[in-house]
């Protein structure tokens, strides 16, 4: 029925976060992560919140978010730290296996 069609998987509409929330959370996982907000003259219109539309996955796959924002950011930080600092030993399969054990195969 959905051969080759893409699906978006994202947070529920009730847990959307701003880019600032994301940067603050990610920076808390990295010791030397420095950032600052630059005020620039806007030459284009930008929406306040960017979000994925996961309605298709929710409707047809009965998919729902399992991870909190904080946990998602922790796993993302862990993956990037592993990728850049541990000899390119990517944690993808380990993270998927842990997710399945915790949320699917309980």
Regions found by a protein language model. Give the residues of each.
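C-terminal substrate-binding subdomain of Rossmann-fold SDR/epimerase-dehydratase oxidoreductases
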Residues: 1-106
């Amino acid at each position: 029925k959905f051969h080759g069609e893409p699906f978006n998987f994202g947070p529920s509409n009730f847990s959307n976060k701003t880019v600032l929330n994301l940067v603050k959370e990610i920076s808390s996982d990295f010791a030397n992560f420095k950032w600052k907000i630059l005020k620039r003259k806007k030459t284009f219109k930008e929406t306040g919140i960017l979000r994925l539309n996961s309605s298709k996955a929710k409707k047809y796959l009965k998919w729902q978010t399992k991870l909190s924002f904080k946990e998602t950011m922790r796993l993302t930080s862990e993956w990037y730290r592993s990728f850049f600092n541990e000899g390119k030993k990517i944690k993808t399969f380990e993270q998927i296996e842990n997710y399945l054990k915790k949320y699917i195969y309980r």
